[in-house]
Design a protein with these regions (language model features):
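Conserved class I S-adenosyl-L-methionine
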Residues: 1-56
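Class I SAM-dependent methyltransferase SAM/SAH-binding core
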Residues: 53, 60-106
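A short acidic, Gly/Pro-enriched loop at the edge of an enzyme's catalytic core
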Residues: 108-115
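Residues lining the SAM
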Residues: 119-121
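A short glycine-rich, Lys/Arg-flanked "PGG" loop and its adjoining helix->strand segment in the class I
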Residues: 133-145
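SAM-dependent methyltransferase
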Residues: 145, 150-221
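C-terminal lobe and adjacent flexible extensions of AdoMet/dcAdoMet transferase-like proteins
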Residues: 215-260
Length: 260
């Protein structure tokens, strides 16, 4: 879940102070290890001192994990509130990570990165195909030739099956009740998210939207942006995705020349 340009200006401003509590059970360390495994399979291993770009970094949890491993990390996110949380965490941990408030569909960074990552279905928040194409092109321009982009998406099936409809367990610091509705014509899932903070009895509602993209569309957009080859994996495995996959990871290698 994260922070890329959609029709809503900052869907994460309200939840930013509680985001880490909401994601407390997410095994970020295991995610970082899985990403490292995929990068190794692509022939671009993540070493100490690798320059890594964390797209839609949110509160910076993944970026900080890679910084702990010795990487030179830059994290970008559209949400000012999330970036402020990331900067606060980095300062508390004494981590040297550059966090920037930038739009995935409109950023320009020098071609100095070995790897770029974009996790937790952040790219599904790009509701217009042209914005996803621009995000891929911008990322390609920020990568060295042979660098890799590793990202995950919610599959068409995941949004069609309305898997966002869920509640979390009792006794948590942030309670939520989410109801999703998928429109097959627009291919957009609208998720009404009701939150309750028991410690303060604060209650609020936010609306998130995600768009589904087919494997063929993603591969076409990546090719146009200058990525080849492209590999796909069932989430958290190193086997190909299947018809019942809910989340797919892509590993796209930057070709020798940037697309125009």
């Amino acid at each position: 879940m994260s922070r890329a340009r959609s029709t809503d200006e900052d869907q994460f401003a309200r939840i930013a102070p509680y985001y880490d509590a909401l994601m407390a059970n997410v095994p970020y360390g295991l995610w970082a290890s899985y990403i490292s495994q995929l990068a190794l399979l692509a022939g671009r291993p993540i070493w100490p001192r690798s320059k890594l770009l964390d797209l839609a970094t949110g509160t910076g949890s993944v970026a900080l994990h890679f910084a702990e491993r010795g990487c030179d990390v830059t994290g970008i996110d559209l949400s000012p509130a999330m970036i402020e949380e990331a900067k606060r965490k980095a300062a508390e941990q004494g981590a040297d990570v550059l966090f920037l408030c930038l739009d995935l569909a409109d950023f320009d960074l020098p071609p100095e990165f070995d790897q770029a990552v974009c996790l937790y279905d952040s790219l599904n928040y790009l509701l217009e195909p042209d914005n996803l194409k621009r995000a891929f092109a911008n990322t390609r321009c920020a990568l060295k030739p042979g660098g890799v982009l590793i990202f995950d998406v919610n599959t068409v099936r995941a949004l069609e099956e309305e898997l966002f409809t869920q509640d979390n367990r009792p006794g948590t610091d942030v309670k939520y009740h989410w109801v999703s509705k998928y429109d097959p014509k627009t291919r957009i899932s609208r998720v009404k998210m009701d939150f309750h903070i028991p410690s303060t009895d604060e209650r609020f509602t936010i609306i998130h939207r995600q768009r589904s993209y087919t494997d063929a569309e993603i591969r076409s957009y990546l090719a146009h942006a200058g990525f080849a080859p492209v590999a796909a994996y069932d989430a958290y495995r190193v086997t190909p995705p299947g018809p019942h996959s809910d989340r797919v990871f892509y590993v796209a290698t930057a070709a020798g020349a940037t697309a125009q």
